[in-house]
Amino acid sequence: MNQEDNTGGGGIFGLFKWTKDALFGTDISPSMKYKDQEERRDRSRYAQDDTNFSMKFGNDSNRRSTNLSRSNSWSGLDSTLHRKYELLPEYNENGFNSIVNGDHHSKERIRSLRSPAPIVPREPLRNEPTDTFGHRLHTKRRTINELSNSQIPFIPPQEDDPLLSKLFNKDGVNEVRRSPYKLSVKDIPGKFPSPLTKRDEIDNYYVRDEDACHKNREYKKAYFDLFAQMDLNSRDLEDLCEDVREQREQFHRNEQTYKQAYEEMRAELVNELKKSKTLFENYYSLGQKYKSLKKVLDQTISHEAELATSRERLYQEEDLKNFEIQTLKQRLSDLELKYTNLQIEKDMQRDNYESEIHDLLLQLSLRNNERKDTSAGSNIFSTGQYDRTPFHNGNNSYDSNSHSWDTDYLKNIDGFIER
């Protein structure tokens, strides 16, 4: 038999091979058999003697190891045998078997098959919808982990539940507990009777029937009271809804009024803002004009100060000029007087010079006449008579009124001097 036949397993052949190996021994050692195996999960198909190994469960987030038991006659079987004969696979504490990984059996199905059927159902909301309050009274409250797999989450009643507190009040429960028998599931209205009845219930049927009728009447009265209270609550709820509707309408009316008032106030505020903007612009322009006028005023004041200084300086210069003019006038008058004196003196000198010239000319003419007389004859002075009146008066002084000159005579003198 080749290596492929040795490694292949499952079905009748695997059982036969296991029997042969158990009786006559195996040709392949366990260490060589599992060498170069790709899938470690196939180790469970072969006998390991007393060797236990750890297996990893991928479905659990916290990977834990578990010890497998000694291999038995069912170790070499594959999942087809379980499906063929409707057998359950090996089930460990985690609710998952690595041999049947990928099988159509799920954890829920395995759990439901292995768990016993409850007499009082633990999930009445899913299994028995006709149960109203029986499971709440006789069933132990389940934890969150037990309810995690339910399609409809079970919500236990609170202590302040009005229906349960009204129907199952503390006094009524204590009275039932003090009764000769305990309240069963069948006594609760709306719950189908259980097919399994107890022995003592059969013996005391008539007594319990009478008590049950009495209790049913009490429960009916409680139900009617609850229905009346529910009717009152419905009326109160309608009134409350009407009040809420009226309050909503009033709220909408107030909101519209507030909205309209807001729009009006907003429009008024916008107009006031526009007016404020215009007023601010005018104020700003007036401020600019005021600054310009103040600047002009400051310049005017400075110019006036400069003008006053210039005027004062001009007044001082005017006084100085007037003083200089007076000085110049005085000097001019002095110069005029001096000029007049000099002119008089000059005239006097000129008169003196003229008289001297006249005397010299007279002497010269006399000398010339004497020479002519000596050379040409006598009576020299018979032809020429000189008048000295233009130059000298009787007092031998200058005549300022006679300024006429004999130009021809002077020319003759000049010609005589040049010769």
UniProtKB/Swiss-Prot annotation:
Family note? Belongs to the BBP1 family.
> Does the UniProt entry include the keyword Membrane?
no
Task: List all Low complexity biased stretches.
Answer: 64-75
Chain segments annotated as coiled-coil in the UniProt record: 229-355
What does it do?
A: Component of the spindle pole body (SPB) required for insertion of the nascent SPB into the nuclear envelope and for the proper execution of spindle pole body (SPB) duplication. Connects the central plaque of the SPB with the half-bridge. Required for proper localization of CDC5 at the SPB and for proper M-phase progression.
Task: List residues, modification Phosphoserine.
Answer: S29, S73, S115
Q: What is this protein called?
A: Spindle pole component BBP1
Q: Subunit structure, per the record?
A: Homodimer. Interacts with KAR1, MPS2 and SPC29.
Biased segments, Basic and acidic residues type:
34-48
The species this protein belongs to is Saccharomyces cerevisiae (strain RM11-1a)
The record's section on InterPro entries has: Bbp1_C, Bbp1_N
